[in-house]
């Protein structure tokens, strides 16, 4: 219950929160951080009441990857680094959508049951895609497991995210 209370104090009911996960456990899986601002522009154009929440894990490497995204999206909720796993799961469960790299956070988002869009480059979506009926993935063009994630276009991600939003209903 305390984790849900913490989550509700950060991500309140009625907000249209889209979670972004710009980090991963190795840099080859990290979609370029500069892509999140144009992605957010596309999402916000279609959903003007939306607000971003940036999720990342503990440690300086995670924070360093998240900082440019937080700086580019000044109204973003900083939902990373200092929360327990159960608090993070409770916050994710209050979001309308998760868009992020192939990472533990992506799998945690899918496990909470929210619509989840995984971004793939050199990791294999056939093995590591998020699971669940509301989960989708997009991959950089090229061979599975070898394509650089930087080749994944913003418009491809935006289209997939908007489609997933249109196909699903808000939970809170």
What are these model-predicted stretches?
Residues 19-24, 53-55, 139:
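Short beta-strands and strand-loop turn motifs
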Residues 7, 65-69, 128:
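Hydrophobic packing residues within well-ordered alpha-helices of enzyme cores
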Residues 78-79, 107-172:
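Nucleotide-sugar donor-binding patch of glycosyltransferase catalytic domains
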Residues 1-29, 33:
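Mid-sequence helix-capping/hinge segment at a functional interface
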Residues 34-123:
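Donor-binding and catalytic core of enzymes assembling or modifying cell-surface/extracellular glycoconjugates
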Residues 20, 36, 157:
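Residue-level signal for inorganic ion chemistry
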